Amino acid sequence: MDWVTIVVYLLLIVFGWFSVCGGSYDYGDRDFLDFSTRAGKQFVWIICSFGLGFVLLMLDDSLYDMFSYLIYIGLMLLLIVTIFIAPDTKGSRSWLILGPVSLQPAEFAKFATALALAKYMSAYSFTMKNWKSSLMLAFLILFPMLLIILRETGSALVYSAFFLMLYREGMPGVVLFSGICAVVYFVVGIRFDAVMIADTPTPIGEFAVLLMVLLFAGGMVWVYKKRWEPTRNIIGGSLGVLLVAYLISEYVVPFNLVWVQWGLCALVVGYLVFLSLSERHLSYFLIGLFALGSIGFLYSSDYFFNKVLEPHQQIRIKVVLGMEEDLAGAGYNVNQSKIAIGSGGLTGKGFLNGTQTKLKYVPEQDTDFIFCTVGEEEGFVGSTAVLLLFLILILRLIAVAERQQSPFGRVYGYSVLSIFLFHLFINIGMVLGLTPVIGIPLPFFSYGGSSLWGFTILLFIFLRIDAGRNRRI
C-alpha cells in the first residue's frame, strides 16, 4: 500500500475541511459540527469518503479491470437520465436529487471513463497507430464530454485532460502540439481582433495567427524531414513577401496584409502538395493539412466565440484576456478573490478572521473559490504549504504510475494524474484571474460531497490497483 499518498490525501482532506469552515462560517455559528451548516455537512461527507476509500481498498483489484466497461456504460446511462430528470439548480441541470442528498453524476463519470480507457488500451491487440483504435479512444472521451457540455461547460472540459495520458502512452506529439496551437490561435485571434497594425487596416490577431501558421509549416518541414531547402523557401519566402507588402501598405497604398497572407498560405499548401507528390512522402501532405486546419480553426473560432458562446461566457473570456474590465459583473468574483488573497499578506489574518470571506464579498468562497479563503486566512505561507502538498501528490502519482507492471494500471494512473492536474491548474488560475471562470472544484478542498467522493474514488481505485501490481504482470 502506498502510505505516502494516503497521508497526503488525509492532510488535504483535513486542511480542506478547515477551509470550508472558514469559507462558510457566519458570526452567529457556534458549532462546526452542526449538521445544518456546510462545515457539518462536509464533515459527514468526509467520514463517508473514508468508508468509501476503505471499501475500495478491500475489493479485489481484478474487479476494476473486469467491470470497467459495465461501470462506464452505467455512468453514461446515468448522465443521459440526468439530462431529462435533473431539476434546474442555478441555471444548471446537472444534479440528481435523491431525498436529502444531491449528486452530480459528472463527477463520477471521470473515474468510469478512466477505467474504460485503461481497459481498452491494455488489450493485447491495442496500438495507438491503428486508426480504429484512435477513433474508439476519441469516442470513449468525447461521449461523456458531449453529454455533460449540454449542461455544464467546466465539467466537460475536464475530459480534455485525458489527452495528456494519451501522449504518455504514445500519441504523436503533433496532436498535443495541435491542441496547444488551437489555444494560442483562439486567444491571439480573439484578443487582438480589433487592434490594427500601425496605420494599416490589418488586424493584429488575424495577421499574427496566419504568420504563425506559415512559420509552423516551415518549421515542421525541418523537424520531420530535415530538409533545409523547402524550409528556407517557406519561411524565408513568406517573411520576405510580407516585409515588402508591409512597406507598400505603410508608405504607398494602405491595404490589409491578411490578403497577402491568404495568397501565401495557398502557395505554401500547394508547394507542400507538390513536394509530397514529387518525392512521394506523405509527411508534406500532412503538414499542408495542418496548415489548412489551422486556418479553418482561426475563422471558425471567431464564429464560435461570437455566435455559439453565451454572452456571459464571452464576457468572462474578455475579462480574463484584458479586453474588458467588468468589476461589478463578470469580473466581480475574480476581483474580490484577488483582494482577499492579497489582504492575507505573508502569514494571513488567522483562522476565521478573514474579512473578505466572512462578510461574503467573494461568491462561492467555499466551493470554486475556496483557495481565496486559504490565501486570506493563512496568507502566502499557508497557500504555499497547500500547493506543496498538491505538488507532492502529483509527483507521487507520477512515481506510482511509472512503477505499474501492467498497461491497465499505468493508463489508469496517468488518467488520475491528468484529472488532478487539470483541476488544480484551472481552479487556482480562476482564483488568480489567469484562466476563465468555468466552475470546477479544487480537489479535496471545495465544499460538496460529489466532488469529494469522485476524487476519493479516483485515487483509491488507483491505490488498490497499485497494491496488486505484482500480480498483474
List the predicted regions and their residue ranges.
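Transmembrane helix boundary and interhelical junction motifs in multipass membrane proteins
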Residues: 152-158, 348-354, 365-367, 438, ...
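Alpha-helical membrane-protein architecture signal
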Residues: 139, 330-334, 347, 363, ...
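Transmembrane alpha-helices of multi-pass inner-membrane enzymes
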Residues: 216-219, 433-470
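Hydrophobic alpha-helical transmembrane segments of multi-pass inner membrane proteins, especially
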Residues: 8-10, 14-22, 26, 32-328, ...
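Long extracytoplasmic/lumenal interhelical loops at the membrane interface
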Residues: 341, 345-378
